[in-house]
Amino acid sequence: GVMKAVQTVENVLDSKLKALDELENMGDEELEAIRERRLKQAKEHAHRTEQLRASGHGDYRTVTEEREFFAQVKTIVRVVAHFGRSATSRCEIVDGHLAKLAGQHLETKFIRVEAERTPYLADRLKIRVLPSIVLIKNNKTEHTIVGFEEMGGEDDFSTLVLEELLFKYNAIT
């Protein structure tokens, strides 16, 4: 057991030393090429982030019309849509968590939908309990989190609990 562990550690160290040797032996052109590639990737990432923010990612906006809902979701890969009602304590709890997550997960669009002002949509998505969080991927409903059951049934669940649930259902990456 101990010898095997020592051998494993030695192998890891050997491979790290070899990688360092390769770096030292690399010419200036190769290092410059790596630097250029990394810079290009960083610029592409910044541009993508800018595009996502421009299309409302990172914000948690309220939708009050069905037409607006469809416009918001039709071109977006991942959407987390909270169907709620103003001045309802459990909906306000969900709003707090989703507003935090929206800023952390730009790959997903987070919206709040006023259920009472979008009756056709709420009916079509079979919204019977508020809050309900509808997870949409490529214009299809993947899952609906109804009430607080999946978060443990209590009002004091953490943002992390909801985040892990959204990750489990592939609503965030």
Description of each model-found segment:
Residues 1-62, 67-73, 167-173:
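Non-globular targeting/processing and membrane-anchoring segments
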Residues 6, 10, 66, 91, ...:
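Generic preference for well-ordered alpha-helical elements
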Residues 52-53, 69, 94, 124-125, ...:
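Chalcogenol-based redox active-site neighborhoods
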Residues 61-65, 83-87, 92-95, 99-120:
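Thiol-based oxidoreductase modules, predominantly thioredoxin-like and allied folds used
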Residues 77, 102-109, 129, 149, ...:
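Eukaryotic basic, amphipathic alpha-helical target segments in cytosolic regions
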Residues 80-81, 133:
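Hydrophobic beta-strand anchors of alpha/beta hydrolase catalytic cores
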Residues 125-137:
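Structural micro-motif
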Residues 135-173:
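Non-catalytic, surface beta->alpha helical segment in thiol-disulfide oxidoreductase systems
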